[in-house]
């Protein structure tokens, strides 16, 4: 079991190398495919001879960068709620691809069958990390492009606007909701109210307990990074310039300030977070009228159910759990 947990952590550990100038060529190893603008395809539904669900694959222009994007929508002439999917840390494509897993594609397809539109976009760091350079912060990694994506959704025929953030993307969703008008609700999926450096410290300590004190030192340095102190040192794969930017966020405060309906979903089987994260959510928001908290026992960090007796199963495609899709959809539709 310990070996299995180590494999999961090595695959899924919070790594912010998307803001590092030394970036592996992720496009060669990813299942992501470059697509021309305005290419649309139908998504067939089981037992449905003619589907109203369509995908529009296009290039989203944001801050001088061209980002591949997919808008999945109901082409029936009616307004539907729409959700922006926000990926976790690292240089993710629009499907948040990891091996055979494509959680954002699965979520988009599942939500579409519930009558909910969605937009997913390559992270800027997926294609342009080297151009962004060492001084990349959450603005360059997330906020600028998410704001552009929200404006795109506002221009469509939608009846409500939601943000669904996975992992670090959940914290970003809260940050956006506290600053953007017109967001109707947010979902934080396997995310945390704790500082990212503290979570990374815990993750590394699980893998390498002998060096826990060093990891605590790194976390302290990341949390204390300021404009005056930043010199380009790296902690947990991110420069201190990045941590200066990240340190401006307060996820719990952002949720309170946004004052909109919020769904927090975590799992006790998530090896990238800890029971402490669930307990903190409950301590912060168990009495909130706007915040719903749901805890699963059997889904991984990316949402899939994994056979814990077979480590090789993480390399095999599995269906995204329908009950998690239903949790998302029911929240968005107010059911």
Residue locations for each model-derived region?
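Accessory cap/linker subdomain of secreted extracellular hydrolases
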Residues: 187-255
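Conserved alpha/beta-hydrolase
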Residues: 103-128
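Short beta-strand/loop motif that positions the catalytic acidic residue
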Residues: 258, 264-266
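N-terminal cap/lid segment of alpha/beta-hydrolase-fold proteins
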Residues: 43-78
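Conserved alpha/beta-hydrolase "acid-adjacent" motif
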Residues: 271-277
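Alpha/beta-hydrolase active-site loop
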Residues: 135-155
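Catalytic active-site module of serine/aspartate enzymes centered on a nucleophile-bearing elbow/loop
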Residues: 299-302, 307-335
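Short, surface-exposed "cap/lid" segments of acyl-processing enzymes
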Residues: 76-110
């Amino acid at each position: 079991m310990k070996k299995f947990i180590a494999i999961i952590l090595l695959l899924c550990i919070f790594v912010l190398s998307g803001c590092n100038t030394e970036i592996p060529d992720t496009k060669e190893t990813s299942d992501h495919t470059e697509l021309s603008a305005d290419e649309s395809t139908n998504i067939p539904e089981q037992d449905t001879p003619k589907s109203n669900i369509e995908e529009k694959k296009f290039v989203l222009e944001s801050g001088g960068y061209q980002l591949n994007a997919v808008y999945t929508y109901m082409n029936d002439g009616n307004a539907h709620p729409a959700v922006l999917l926000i990926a976790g840390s690292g240089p993710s494509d629009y499907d948040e691809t990891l091996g055979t897993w494509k959680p954002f594609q699965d979520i988009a397809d599942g939500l579409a069958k519930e009558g909910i539109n969605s937009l997913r976009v390559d992270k800027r760091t997926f294609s342009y990390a080297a151009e962004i350079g060492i001084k990349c912060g959450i603005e360059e990694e997330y906020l600028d492009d998410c704001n552009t994506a929200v404006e795109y959704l506002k221009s469509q025929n939608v009846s409500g606007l939601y943000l669904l953030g996975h992992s670090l993307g959940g914290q970003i969703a809260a940050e956006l909701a506290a600053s953007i008008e017109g967001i109707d609700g947010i979902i934080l999926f396997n995310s945390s109210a704790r500082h990212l450096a503290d979570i990374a410290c815990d993750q590394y300590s699980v893998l390498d307990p002998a060096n826990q004190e060093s990891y605590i030192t790194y976390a302290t340095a990341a949390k204390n990074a300021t404009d005056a102190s930043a010199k380009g040192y790296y902690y947990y794969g991110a420069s201190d310039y990045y941590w200066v930017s990240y340190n401006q966020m307060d996820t719990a405060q952002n949720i309170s300030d946004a004052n909109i309906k919020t769904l927090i979903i975590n799992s006790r089987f998530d090896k990238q977070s800890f029971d402490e994260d669930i307990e903190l959510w409950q301590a912060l928001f168990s009495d909130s009228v706007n915040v719903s908290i749901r805890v699963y026992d059997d889904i991984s960090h990316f949402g899939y159910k994994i056979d814990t007796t077979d480590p090789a199963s993480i390399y095999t495609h599995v269906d995204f759990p329908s009950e998690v899709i239903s949790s998302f959809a029911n929240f968005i539709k107010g059911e």
